Amino acid sequence: MKKLLFITMGLVSNLSIAQTNENLELLYQWSEDSLVGSSAYNNTYNEVWGFVMNNKEFAVIGSTAGTHIFDVTDAENSKEVQFIAGEDFGPAIIHRDYHDRNGYLYAVSDEGNSSLQIIDLKQLPDTATVVYDSNELIETSHNIFIDEAKN
């Protein structure tokens, strides 16, 4: 029985890495050479989130430096429209997390001397304004969740 389990696990793991992308096409790729990788894993980018504001589609990417907001309405011509520096930044930052609600983006980080940042998105793509940046409520957090059912 143990041999059968071992063989099955081996076959399943090989099949899982042999998957191809079907009907997917890379439309845009962004990288910023001035950003540093994390000291733990050398990852520069660490989270992605998306939302619609003012009839445009936006993507959020977390990095070791902060929050990058992209207009992806025309995916092949996507562009970074806003950058918000994290309360803490640099190689100590491994993970950021985001959630949006009612025109605001909520941002947290799992490392460093971080904070809860609340960013007003209502004037995108022209501006994104940090309206709250404090560690009074949250200093570090791996994930953020908004219970939308409770309003």
Model-derived features with residue positions:
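Bacterial Sec-dependent N-terminal signal peptides
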Residues: 1-22
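Feature marking well-ordered beta-strand scaffolds used for ligand recognition
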Residues: 18-151
